[in-house]
């Protein structure tokens, strides 16, 4: 439904180019999350490595069927913690800095259709599922991760529990034998659930997507204090016991809109109490529209989310299904996330996962290409994820070429890393290697082209911070070629990263912010020449190249214009732009205040041209605001745009 807004905008005359001292500018707190520079390895403990066969005897163990426990556990994932081992030390060797594990809590009893090997059917949230190990095993896992300087991210569920509640003519009940099936005790109280039937056809008052049972699982009333405070107590203890650095929150779009506003501050306080000052929470909100997705961050106050729009766009580009302009269009939405507390660089990016399927399978299904293109296109997708904005996450097994059989999604995307007993997985095709047969995937890791490439990409990020989620500017996006400039503020050096999804080499002239010193190739085999700030490069087919300038950025001139603001009817926010022209990679910070003597409030910082932020009318309803924007170039010079005034009517 469209809403009418009244907008009154007054701007001053165009300000001449000038460096200014801006002592009155308020300090802007960093919006970067604690994982902002990390590389995440996402893994199913049950499918990684069996380190303790004594826990294979519990009900639900059936390594020949895809829907049951297969024997992997915390001991297997931990390993010996020594170099050359296949546990955490192997993950560290691949270049990852954080490990995200599926939920470890005790699962409901297995059914004839499967067991909770994936961790999303929890009933006892205070203990480790015995199939995966014990609390002592979890302590050892955490200690090994700390020794290897690996951060731990735990997948958690707050929307629902395992399926214990039944219905009789729309009346919910718990059978006597399951009356105390859940832990802690408040989870056994029917009053803490919505009890309105399936999400697809619920009978309650409210949106079924939030109050209905997710695939038959018991939907909690996450709007109730007993629930959000109870979950805060539960998951705070996991942080305190094991020193976790982050949570991935499953089904985050299905909880109450205000849940994270109540829950997250308690989680962050618990983390700080044990010395973790920048705990990261990212939610699973399966929506490929960035306009929808950003509202979960800006209005619902999820710290950050998994970037489903990036997944779709990156895979389509890597497959050759779409061209570079589509990637450019995606990044144009990044300003929607910008605020004083959020930024698109905090989004957790990925190419495939345990639900939709693996990246190679998705690339294969997007467009008919020659069989020998699948490997380079898979590498291209990973390079785009590693070197553009966001926090990359790689799904376990992708590094050894796992693809998937049939549709390749859900159960069929959760293969064993150890020697499998599932028949279809023994003969399943792989990208970059042969079917695994009776062997295991650890033996082929060091020689696998994807694993080797990921190590190279990780090494480049580690040696060159500009490549690791730093400032980014799109320099060229046409047909099959996308070229980005990257910059780390501390270094002041410009990098060019070019991605070619075409089967032919592409030549282009790229205008940069560096006019002297030439360029050094860090990745790939490009043909490069430079004249002043224009770099002429030829990027080989289906490849990524990285160039580093030999001298610091020197094209730092800035021309400032005016601030404009008008309603963006697609998002419902006020798009507020700063007219700034420069070849440099700048920082533009926007501010507002509602009275002449009031404090300046940060609206966020944009580091990618064109420079803009989006003002949420719900935050400033019926207020007259004075707007201000400052610009900082690579040499540290500051500029200020003329102030503007805006009045926002009630939504």
Which residues fall in each region the model found?
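Long, low-complexity serine/threonine/glycine- and acidic-rich segments characteristic of extracellular
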Residues: 563-651
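Active-site-proximal helices and loops of the catalytic beta/alpha 8
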Residues: 142, 160, 233-343, 347, ...
């Amino acid at each position: 439904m469209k809403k009418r807004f009244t907008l009154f905008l007054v701007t001053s005359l165009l300000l001449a180019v000038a460096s200014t001292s801006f002592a009155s500018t308020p300090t802007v707190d960093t919006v970067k999350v604690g994982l902002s520079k990390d590389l995440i390895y996402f893994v199913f403990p049950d499918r990684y490595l069996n380190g303790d066969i004594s826990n294979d005897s519990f009900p639900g163990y059936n390594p020949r069927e895809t829907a049951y426990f297969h024997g992997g556990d915390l001991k297997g994932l931990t390993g010996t913690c020594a170099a050359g081992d296949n546990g955490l030390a192997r993950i560290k060797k691949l270049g990852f800095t954080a490990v995200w594990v599926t939920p470890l809590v005790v699962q409901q009893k297995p059914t004839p259709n499967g067991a909770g090997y994936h961790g999303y059917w929890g009933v006892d949230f205070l203990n480790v599922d015995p199939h995966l190990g014990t609390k002592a095993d979890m302590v050892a896992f955490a200690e090994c991760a700390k020794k290897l300087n690996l951060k731990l991210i735990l997948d958690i569920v707050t929307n629902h529990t395992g399926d214990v509640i039944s219905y009789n003519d729309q009346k919910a009940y718990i059978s006597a034998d399951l009356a105390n099936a859940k832990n802690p005790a408040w989870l056994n109280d029917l009053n803490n659930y919505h009890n309105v039937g399936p999400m697809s056809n619920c009978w309650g008052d409210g949106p079924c997507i939030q109050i209905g049972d997710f695939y038959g699982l018991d939907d909690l009333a996450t709007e109730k204090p007993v629930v959000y405070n109870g979950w805060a107590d539960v998951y705070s203890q996991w942080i305190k016991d094991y020193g976790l650095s982050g949570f991935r929150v499953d089904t985050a779009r299905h909880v109450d809109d205000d849940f994270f506003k109540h829950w997250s501050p308690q989680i962050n306080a618990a983390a700080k109490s044990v010395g973790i000052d920048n705990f990261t929470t990212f939610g699973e909100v399966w929506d490929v529209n960035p306009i929808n997705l950003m509202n979960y961050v800006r209005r619902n106050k999820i710290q950050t989310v998994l970037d489903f729009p990036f997944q779709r766009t990156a895979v389509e580009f890597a497959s050759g299904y779409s061209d570079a302009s589509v990637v450019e269009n995606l990044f144009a939405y990044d300003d929607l996330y910008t605020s004083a507390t959020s930024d698109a660089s905090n989004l957790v990016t990925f190419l495939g996962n345990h639900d939709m399927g693996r990246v190679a399978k998705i690339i294969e299904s997007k467009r008919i290409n020659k069989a020998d293109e699948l490997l380079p296109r898979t590498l291209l997708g990973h390079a785009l994820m590693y070197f553009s904005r966001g926090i990359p996450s790689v799904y376990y097994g992708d590094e050894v070429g796992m693809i998937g059989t049939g549709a390749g999604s859900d159960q069929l995307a959760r293969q064993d890393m150890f020697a499998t007993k599932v028949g279809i997985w023994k003969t399943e095709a792989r990208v970059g290697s042969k079917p695994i047969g009776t062997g295991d995937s650890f033996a082929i890791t060091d020689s696998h082209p994807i694993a080797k490439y990921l190590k190279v990409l990780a090494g480049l990020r580690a040696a060159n911070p500009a490549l690791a989620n730093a400032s980014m500017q799109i320099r060229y996006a046409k047909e099959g070629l996308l070229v980005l400039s990257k910059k780390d503020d501390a270094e002041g050096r410009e990098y060019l990263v070019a991605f070619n999804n075409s089967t032919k080499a592409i030549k282009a002239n790229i205008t940069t912010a560096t006019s002297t010193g030439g360029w050094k190739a860090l990745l790939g085999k490009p043909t490069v020449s430079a004249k002043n700030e224009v770099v002429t490069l030829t990027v080989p087919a289906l490849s990524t190249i990285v160039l580093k300038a030999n001298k610091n950025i020197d094209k730092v001139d800035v021309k400032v214009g005016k601030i404009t603001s008008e309603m963006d009817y697609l998002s419902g926010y006020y798009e507020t732009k700063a007219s700034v022209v420069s070849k440099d990679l700048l920082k533009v910070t926007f501010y507002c205040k509602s009275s002449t003597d009031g404090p300046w409030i940060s609206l966020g910082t944009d580091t990618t041209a064109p420079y803009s932020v989006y003002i949420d009318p719900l935050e400033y309803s019926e207020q007259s605001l004075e707007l201000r924007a400052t610009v900082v170039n690579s040499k540290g010079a500051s500029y200020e745009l003329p102030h503007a005034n805006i009045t926002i009517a009630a939504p």
